[in-house]
Amino acid sequence: MATRLSDLFGNSRIIAGLLVNLLSSICIVFINKWIYVHYGFPNMTLTLIHFVMTWLGLFICQKMDIFAPKSLRPSKILLLALSFCGFVVFTNLSLQSNTIGTYQLAKVMTTPVIIAIQTMYYRKTFSTKIKLTLVPITLGVILNSYYDVRFNLMGMIFATLGVLVTSLYQVWVGAKQHELQVNSMQLLYYQAPMSSAFLLVLVPFFEPLTGDGGIFGPWSFLALFMVLLSGVIAFLVNLSIYWIIGNTSPVTYNMFGHFKFCITLLGGYVLFQDPLSLNQGLGILCTLTGILAYTHFKLAEQEEGKSRLTQRP
């Protein structure tokens, strides 16, 4: 009886964690888009608020012994903090300038770029099956972007820069975690305030401080509430991702990611009336097929690697 109650409690915690991640990951996209469309809130300032809220959330977490901070030299994570700024700023600019469908599909291109970076600069090898899955992923993104009736050059530039900087950031995060022997929360705890400091210096040069569109402008209570809510949700996204990776299998995490991808796309078309042509639909289907194939082959290779290790004498 005690075992069954323990299993039930454990499953309930996992379901709750997945639900928090689902709601926060989807809400952050829609709320940010809503803030850009209806209030025109400055992008870099919103990113700065996200960083500050994330650090405050992590500070509370470490006080509650959810994780133990590890002392790190600022010089060791300087480049990582800069790339973190670029990754979030350009990703948000892509969301601001593109439809949610194009924004979501552009993010998928992070996988092919990471593979290219790891192949060229880290001498990492990938199987032919993995490389072939990049064809439908890339083709689908191109199809969707080409037939997007709201296509704009600046949006594509922001999306491209977002993909490049995000890919570099993700590669460097993995390398730094291994080099410094820290987990993602310990790294983010030091990285978030450094990134906040960088943006605090840059914001006055790129965005107005007062008047319409400025951080100290005449914002309504609802606009400020939405911005603060966005910051809280940004923290929940980071926290729930860390929790899911630590408490579920890679299959659960990846399959759940595909579910969120589809829900976010659907929500963009429903909430913001983003137009969807037949060719765009084919592009989305093509990309999703590539993502599923990539996940299947990647997980199969990981399981094969584990079985080889266990079979060694």
From Swiss-Prot:
Keywords: Membrane, Transmembrane, Transmembrane helix. The chain crosses the membrane at residues 14-34, 40-60, 77-97, 100-122, 130-146, 153-173, 187-207, 215-235, 252-272, 275-295. Disulfide bonds: none annotated. GO terms for cellular component: Golgi apparatus; membrane. InterPro entries: Sugar_P_trans_dom, TPT_transporter. GO terms for biological process: transmembrane transport. It is found in: Membrane. Signal peptide: none annotated. It comes from Danio rerio. It comes from the Eukaryota. It is a multi-pass membrane protein. Putative transporter. The keyword Membrane applies. Coiled coil: none annotated. GO terms for molecular function: antiporter activity; nucleotide-sugar transmembrane transporter activity. The keyword Transmembrane applies. PANTHER family: SOLUTE CARRIER FAMILY 35. Belongs to the TPT transporter family. SLC35E subfamily. This is Solute carrier family 35 member E3.
